[in-house]
C-alpha cells in the first residue's frame, strides 16, 4: 500500500499496511468491508510452513488462540486459507508495546508497574486454567490497547497441556534467554505454569527497575546468574516488592511461589481488580481445513487486487493512531518516545525522501534495497539480537504531503531507537513539523470529502 495506490482484498477484508513481519509470517492492518471494523491479519505462506515442518506449531498457535477469551489476551476472530496462504484474523491493538513505555521513561512508578503486572497475572492464570502455557513472556509480547489495557500477544511458542509427557512436564526449550526460568534452560522437563511465573517476575523487575535482573554479554555467564538467581533489587523498590520478587525468582521451582499464593500477596492485592471475561465453547475440529487436507476447495478464500484511491492509505494509517489524534503522526522526537515503528511527515517529493534516507543510512553501516516506494535497510554489523533491519515506506496523504514510516523488522528495539535518533539528525531538511496538527487534520479532511 504505497504511493502508487491499490490494495488487496481477502474474503471480506481489505488488506493495508504491514504492521510487522517475521521468518514465517507477516502481520497486516485490515478492514472488514462488511462491518467497518479494523483488525490485524497474520499471513502465513503455506509452502514455507510445509517446507520447515511448521504445521504442528501453526495448528497449535491457532488452537491456543481459539481457546482463549480474556480481556488481557489478543483475541482471534477467525481463520481463513487460500491455495497458498493462511490468514489469522486477530484483534487490532493500537497502543504499542509495553516495552515502549520502559524504553522512553526508563522505568515505571511502582503503582503503575503493579497495575500492568496484575493484568499480566490475570491473563497468565486464565491461560493456565485452559491448559495453555505461553513460554515466551517478555515486555515485547505485551501490548497496550488505546485505553491502556494490557494485552498478551504471540502464542506461537505456546504448548497445550495435551503435549505434556508422561512425567507431567514440558520438554521443549523456548523463549528469550533473559526471561527464561532456570529449569527451562536445563531442558530436563519443567512445569509450564511455574516457568511462566518466573518470566512474569523478570517482567515485573524490568517494569520497576528499567533494566534486566539477569544480564551478561556471555551466554554461559548469563545462564549461571539465572541458575543462582544472582540479582539484587535497586534501592527504590519497596520492601514488600523486593520480598515478592525474590519469591517469584526462586531458582527452585518446587519452592517458588505459585500464582494462587501470589494473588493473595499483600503487595499484589493493592488496588487489584478481578478480570471480567466471557466463557465460550470452542470447537477445534476445523483446524485441519486451513491446510486443505481433505481436498475440499469450497472453504478457500480468493485473494484479489483492487485499485483504490491512494489517499485512503493515509486514513488507514491515521485510523491506527489513538483516537484519530493527528498529532501522533507528527511525533516530537525530542520526547524520546520512539517505538518499534515510528513516522514523520515531509513536504518533499516521495523519490527525494527515499533518496535522502538512502544517503543518510549508507554511512551508518546499512545496506539499502529499494523497491517502488519502499526501502529495506539492513545493518552490516551483528547486534544484540542479530542484524538490525528497518523497513521504510512512503504514504501519500495529499499531493503535497507525505508520511514516512520506519519500522524495525529485525534486531533489538533499543538499537532501533538509537538508529532512529541518529538518522533523524541527518534528515532535518526532510522532516516537516506542522504549526498545528489541526491544520494538517483540516487539510486531510478536505481531501477526504467529496
From Swiss-Prot:
Which residue positions are annotated as catalytic?
A: 136
Instruction: Give the residues the record marks as binding ATP.
Output: 19-27, 42
Q: Which UniProt keywords apply?
A: ATP-binding, Kinase, Manganese, Nucleotide-binding, Serine/threonine-protein kinase, Transferase
- The segments labelled PPI in the record are 339-368
* Swiss-Prot/TrEMBL cofactor(s): Mn(2+)
Q: Where is this region: Activation loop?
A: 154-183
For this protein, what is the EC number? 2.7.11.1
**One Gene Ontology cellular component:** cytosol
Domain Protein kinase, chain residue ranges per copy: 13-268
Q: Tell me, which GO biological process terms does this entry list?
A: potassium ion import across plasma membrane; regulation of stomatal movement; response to nutrient; response to water deprivation; signal transduction; stomatal movement
Query: What SUPFAM superfamilies does the record point to?
Result: Protein kinase-like (PK-like)
Entry superkingdom = Eukaryota
Q: Which Pfam families does UniProt cross-reference here?
A: NAF, Pkinase
Catalytic activity of the protein? L-seryl-[protein] + ATP = O-phospho-L-seryl-[protein] + ADP + H(+); L-threonyl-[protein] + ATP = O-phospho-L-threonyl-[protein] + ADP + H(+)
Q: Which family does it belong to?
A: Belongs to the protein kinase superfamily. CAMK Ser/Thr protein kinase family. SNF1 subfamily.
Domain annotation text?
The activation loop within the kinase domain is the target of phosphorylation/activation by upstream protein kinases. The PPI motif mediates the interaction with the ABI (abscisic acid-insensitive) phosphatases.
Q: What does this protein do?
A: CIPK serine-threonine protein kinases interact with CBL proteins. Binding of a CBL protein to the regulatory NAF domain of CIPK protein lead to the activation of the kinase in a calcium-dependent manner.
PANTHER family (alphabetical) = CALCIUM/CALMODULIN-DEPENDENT PROTEIN KINASE KINASE-RELATED (PTHR43895), NON-SPECIFIC SERINE_THREONINE PROTEIN KINASE (PTHR43895:SF123)
Q: What is this protein called?
A: CBL-interacting protein kinase 23
Encoding gene per record = CIPK23
